[in-house]
């Protein structure tokens, strides 16, 4: 396989000693200089003062994106809020233990006075949160503590005027608590009166200018199929298409594959692959399967990250792009021509063009950006005729989990007080040493896409608050237990469902209807989550613990027509963002089932490429050939 790295170099990017900068003097002439390391982008703009013959005054802005620090120490990159921030950030995720400093080197063009601005937030202002950190320059604190302002809005905080004595300076972020302090960027400016913008549109333009991000990203190539989303569905789609001889780009916004089944989220695979109407479907899912380590296993290796990547690496037709968030779609009329992604660490942008695209993001990101019709939330009974539908349509969705686990130690340990977290009591607390699927937030009171950060933070407040209570009040049981792992990447269940040519519903599932284009065989119960009644009693409107009622079903097939967009002509879907009703979604959403959807998409994309037709054209004109592949009657071409 051709793994394409995400290099730090760009045409405009720095070499090991500095970066090319562009300055315009008062006469409009251009001068280039080499003035900083690869983590700081200088934008030098000269303001022409039209007062008599006064000379031009120079302003130098040094923007440092924290996700690009050379050594992130114990801080982690979080891209989950890219859709509302247009940026990633780093976070001190230490589970109550301060993490190692994040460190980088900055090269200033001159010594002297600079105004420091720090973009951060107080993530748990109840009344003040625990995410405190300091900015360190050459081993000395700048004198302020950030992350405890009492405001949960992302904005620039005034760090005061700093006297830079060394042109080459070591910059560090020092975590003070281990409780998820976070920082998006730092700005040094020699215009001591300048205030950076906070409004998103202006901030995005400001950021793009200083990072020299143009409208011409690096060309990442053209592919037969571009798969966006490297969860189980997307990875299986990429492998399936590659084994049919197609060139494939697989784009994933995290450093690992597997999505909810990766070590970052740790949800086990569910759904059967051995009850298939087409028994040979599911072979790739079996390759990816790591058995059943359960949910939230403290041993990361149990989720097989390395094996998943090694399987993809073995496919010479796949070009893998990790750490790449797709944020833009290019199209002509109703046909996607390319997607653009940004590296979540280096901010390098790449353009991926292709004949066909598969949205395996879970959130339906590609479809949404392309203008595909979609649905989010519950339909009404009047709309669907389903007994499980809501009386009135609403925004209710299944929630997001941040799983956690503790381990036994030889000695007693303590845990900090957490006045900013959810508060528990003898009357109500959750007496367990690790989580399972029930730890879940987002039942319509949070938007699972635009409020992903708030959902995760709400889950963290529940986890840390409950653990603090257990350590203090049940010492006999929990005294020697220690938090070993808490997920900072949310395991999302439901968001957008892209509308296809068919909408699978509750009756299709319970009546076992079989359609001519039935493809994936699904077996999971109709499993719709709702807030646990006792949790609602004590945390009404702030629930973080779920209940469910499993409705058993016989094996049924999902029509191929659910796996492509109704109004975007070259867009496939696989995973939880296919078009079903909310009720049917309760059964189709589990990962082995989603992986088989990916396999079908890979086969269908082969036929679409072969005949230069659309995903719909595969259904209308070539369904027997697709069925033959599903049955194993049609051999894959030799790559």
Specify the residue positions occupied by each region the protein language model found.
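Flavin (FAD/FMN)-binding glycine-rich loop and adjacent Rossmann-like elements that form
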Residues: 212-215, 219, 260, 323, ...
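Sec/Tat signal peptide C-region and signal peptidase I cleavage site
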Residues: 54-58
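N-terminal Rossmann-fold NAD(P) dinucleotide-binding loop
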Residues: 234
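Extracytoplasmic
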Residues: 59-218
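Bacterial N-terminal signal peptides
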Residues: 42-53
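N-terminal secretory signal peptides that target proteins for export/translocation
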Residues: 1-38
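Conserved N-terminal/central alpha/beta ligand/cofactor-binding core
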Residues: 246-247, 252-332, 375, 398-405
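Beta1/beta-strand and adjacent pyrophosphate-binding region of the FAD-binding site
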Residues: 219-231
């Amino acid at each position: 396989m051709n793994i394409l790295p995400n290099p730090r170099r760009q045409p405009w990017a720095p070499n090991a000693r500095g970066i090319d900068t562009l300055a315009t003097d008062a006469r409009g002439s251009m001068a280039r200089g080499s003035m900083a390391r690869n983590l700081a982008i200088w934008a030098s703009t000269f303001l022409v003062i039209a007062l008599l013959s006064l000379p031009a005054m120079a302003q130098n802005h040094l923007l440092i994106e924290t996700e690009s620090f050379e050594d992130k120490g114990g801080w982690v990159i979080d891209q989950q809020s890219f859709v509302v921030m247009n940026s990633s950030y780093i976070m001190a995720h230490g589970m109550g233990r301060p993490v190692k400093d994040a460190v980088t080197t900055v090269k200033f063009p001159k010594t002297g006075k600079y105004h420091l601005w720090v973009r951060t937030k107080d993530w748990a202002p109840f009344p003040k949160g625990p995410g405190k950190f300091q900015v360190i320059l050459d081993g000395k604190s700048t004198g302020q503590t950030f992350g405890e302002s009492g405001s949960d809005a992302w904005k620039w905080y005034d760090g005061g005027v700093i006297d830079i004595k060394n042109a080459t300076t070591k910059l560090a972020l020092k975590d003070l608590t281990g409780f998820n302090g976070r920082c998006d960027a730092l700005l040094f400016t020699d215009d001591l009166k300048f205030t950076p913008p906070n409004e998103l549109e202006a901030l995005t333009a400001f950021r793009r200018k200083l990072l020299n991000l143009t409208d011409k990203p690096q060309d990442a190539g053209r592919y037969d199929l571009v798969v966006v989303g490297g969860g189980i569905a997307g990875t299986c789609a990429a492998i399936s298409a590659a084994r049919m001889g197609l060139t494939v780009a697989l784009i994933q916004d995290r450093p690992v594959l597997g999505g909810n089944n990766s070590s970052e989220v740790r949800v086990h695979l569910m759904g059967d692959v051995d009850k298939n109407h087409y028994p040979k479907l599911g072979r790739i899912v079996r390759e990816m399967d790591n058995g059943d380590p359960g949910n939230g296993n403290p041993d990361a290796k149990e989720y097989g990250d390395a094996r998943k990547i090694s399987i993809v690496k073995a496919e010479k037709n796949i070009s893998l792009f990790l750490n790449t968030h797709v944020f833009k779609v290019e199209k002509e009329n109703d046909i996607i021509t390319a997607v653009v992604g940004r590296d979540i660490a280096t901010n390098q942008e790449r353009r991926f063009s292709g004949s066909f695209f598969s949205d395996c993001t879970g959130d339906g990101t590609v479809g949404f950006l392309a203008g595909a019709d979609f649905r989010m939330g519950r339909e009404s009974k009047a709309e669907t005729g389903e007994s499980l539908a809501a009386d009135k349509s609403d925004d209710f969705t299944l929630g997001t989990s941040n799983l956690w686990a503790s381990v036994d130690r030889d000695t007693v340990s303590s845990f900090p007080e957490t006045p900013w977290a959810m508060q528990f009591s003898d009357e109500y607390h959750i007496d367990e040493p690790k989580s399972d699927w029930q730890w879940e937030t987002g039942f319509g009171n949070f938007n699972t896409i635009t409020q992903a950060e708030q959902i995760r933070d709400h889950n963290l407040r529940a986890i840390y608050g409950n653990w603090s209570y257990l350590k203090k009040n049940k010492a006999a049981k929990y005294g020697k237990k220690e938090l070993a792992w808490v997920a900072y990447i949310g395991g999302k269940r439901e968001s957008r469902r892209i509308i296809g040519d068919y909408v699978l519903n509750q009756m299709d599932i319970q009546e076992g209807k079989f359609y001519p284009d039935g493809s994936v065989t699904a077996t999971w119960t109709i499993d719709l989550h709702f807030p646990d009644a006792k949790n609602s009693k004590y945390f009404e409107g702030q629930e973080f613990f779920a209940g469910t009622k499993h409705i058993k079903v016989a094996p049924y097939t999902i029509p191929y027509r659910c796996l492509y967009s109704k109004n975007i002509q070259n867009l496939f879907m696989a995973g939880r963002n296919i078009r079903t009703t909310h009720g049917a979604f309760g059964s189709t959403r589990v990962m082995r089932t989603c992986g088989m959807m990916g396999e079908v998409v890979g086969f269908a994309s082969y036929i679409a490429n072969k005949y230069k037709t659309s995903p719909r054209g595969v259904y209308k004109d070539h369904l027997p050939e697709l069925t033959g592949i599903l049955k194993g009657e049609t051999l894959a071409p030799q790559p």
